[in-house]
A protein has these predicted regions:
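A structural signal for short, well-ordered beta-strand segments and their strand-loop junctions
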Residues: 42-46, 91-100, 145-150
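Proline-aspartate-enriched helix->loop->beta-strand connector
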Residues: 131-154
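C-terminal capping/extension of enzyme domains
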Residues: 1-10, 119-131, 157-251
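Active-site and ligand/interface coordination hotspots across diverse enzymes
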Residues: 1-80, 129-132, 197-204, 234-251
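A solvent-exposed, charged loop/short amphipathic helix patch at secondary-structure junctions
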Residues: 55-72, 113-122, 167-174
Length: 251
């Protein structure tokens, strides 16, 4: 899958000419993507890459493996993620992929709702990006466990479909239990809805995949609220054995 080629097509689409001047700033900044090229057991997702004023504009592609290496330099975003993936006895780094479900660069979280979701062309811009993300997850990564590391992005997986009618990627989710680190769900299929943003995907490769909806994690998040390598490794083991055969109280 040529992610960069598809992003170039999205960023060059004619309908984006109708965006507001403020919304067009994200087009000028370019996009960020992660080079996910193989299957991984664990996928961590954010919502969109940030943009710091001192950063240069342009298209950027990153190697997730290098960003997650233990020896990588300290970073306010990546260091807390790394600490979730290993301890003295467990190392999940090589089993882990990362992506942001959207590719535009913006620090202000209200920008998405204010400038994009409020306009038809903005919604189309979001849908095109989310379609690419879903294909990447389904066809390339095919994870056994997904950590949705941002409450704002949970709805795009289909978590609010029943309560609010928000379909987006439209995964059919069955709640397993609440854990100290977040809500644990299992993917059982795809929601039967014409509103799914990737109707060409008629069957999901992720049946049985566990999804942990947790909070945004940064350097200020209390240590006891961050999922640990031991906990994530246990979830991967549970997924491989079958969640129905595992005592939920052990979580």
């Amino acid at each position: 899958m040529d992610i960069e080629k598809r992003l170039d097509e999205i960023w060059g689409a004619d309908y984006l000419n109708a965006l507001s001047p403020e919304a067009k700033t994200v087009l000028e900044r370019g996009y960020v993507f992660y080079n996910n090229e193989e299957r991984k057991d664990l996928l961590i997702t954010g919502i969109n890459p940030s943009f710091r004023e001192e950063e240069s504009k342009g298209q950027l592609g990153f190697n997730t493996t290098k960003l997650l290496e233990r020896e990588a330099k300290h970073d306010v975003y990546w260091s807390p993620i790394r600490k979730m993936l290993y301890n003295q006895d467990i190392d999940l780094i090589d089993q882990t992929a990362y992506l942001d479900i959207f590719y535009f660069r913006e620090k202000e979280q209200t920008f998405l709702k204010r400038e994009l979701l409020s306009r038809p062309e903005g919604i189309r811009f979001i849908v095109d990006q989310l379609n690419l993300t879903m294909h990447t997850i389904e066809e390339v990564i095919q994870p056994k466990l997904i950590i949705v590391k941002n409450k704002e992005s949970a709805a795009y997986f289909g978590k609010e479909a029943e309560k609010r009618g928000w379909i987006w990627m439209g995964y059919a989710l069955e709640q397993v239990c609440n854990t100290y680190y977040g809500e644990l769900y299992k993917i059982t299929g795809l929601i039967d809805s014409h509103e799914r943003i990737a109707p060409e995907i008629t069957q999901t490769a992720l049946v049985g995949t566990l999804v942990l909806f947790t909070r945004h994690i940064n350097q200020y998040t209390k240590r006891e609220l961050r999922p640990t390598a031991e906990f994530l490794n246990r979830l991967l083991h549970i997924q491989s054995q079958g969640i129905d055969s595992y005592p939920i109280e052990d979580l």
